[in-house]
Amino acid sequence: METSTNPVLVMMVGLSASGKSTIANNLAKENNYIIFSSDELREELYGDVNDQTHNHELFIELHKRIKTALKEGNNVIYDACNLSSKRRVAFLQELKHINCRKECIIAATPYEQCLRNNASRDRHVPDYVIERMYKSFDTPYFYEGFDHISIEYWKGSCNGSLLPMSWAIDYKNYNQDNPHHELTLGVHCINAFFWLYNNKLYDNASIGTIMHAALIHDCGKPFCKTFKNNKVETTDIAHYYGHEHVGAYDSLFFTYGFGISSLFVSALISNHMKPWVWERDNNEKMYNKYKKLWGDYFMECVMILHVADKAAH
């Protein structure tokens, strides 16, 4: 952690049973931070750490305590899942009149490991809760208001064996079972990669990172594939609800070439479906909202990936 003359907020981000609290406790011991935990506050206020019926009131109180501690000059760790970009942005906006450094730590633990960790706990949540979190993970990025973002990997989870091109080749025969996706999953992703490589249309410093994102932008699809629509009706075609979130999370565990940021790749994948939505709905308001949030450069990068995604169908 970098030193700062101002108080520091560290926001933990991660699935349940990913080891967030262990990271937070170790950091607090080493650096004299005060931990504010959503789980501990649930137990304090409602007598049940699993109580989810008072979340609105709980987070109002939690945020109040964090802001008070920061105003008093204390370094603070915000220990909760914090998976929603919208909610992270809203909270960081609450701090705009408090002069503090804002940091984020992503507890990057593979989904299957989270399930194993959860099963071995005395106090555990249902597996479907962790699955729901997995399918709603928004990658934290600097446009949200953070000064620094780091990734803490579960031991052995980032061992250099998972390469983007290898993944795409492994899925060259994976049928997407959807008329909007006539190509197999792997071929589509490889086509997006080579479309960017062959066209060289963009004078963009991050084009190498975008190409890596193109190779695995749909890597969350196999996990999310379902033959039920959003009304839970059985259909003849496959749907992939939440695949961008699963893909963004899983992309953190790939190994990239020199100079490629896994965080940037993940952020691109996390947001790659948004242009499809605002183009489909002709929603200029949505486009302007994200352009204001992201800034020109990140918007440009997302749109480059989007153009490649469309061209590769």
For each predicted feature, which ranges?
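Short hydrophobic/aromatic beta-strand immediately N-terminal to the Walker A/P-loop
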Residues: 9-11
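Conserved phosphate-donor/acceptor-positioning beta-strand/loop module used by diverse small-molecule
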Residues: 98-114
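Conserved GTP-binding G-domain of TRAFAC-class P-loop NTPases and closely related GTPase folds
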Residues: 13, 18, 26, 112-164
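Divalent metal-dependent catalytic cores for phosphoryl transfer on phosphate-bearing substrates
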Residues: 197, 201-312
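Conserved substrate/cofactor phosphate-moiety recognition/catalytic segment
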Residues: 22-74
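Phosphate-binding P-loop
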Residues: 1-6, 69
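Acidic/His-rich, divalent-metal-binding segments that scaffold phosphate/diphosphate chemistry
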Residues: 153-235
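Acidic, metal-coordinating catalytic cores used for nucleic-acid/nucleotide bond scission
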Residues: 79-91
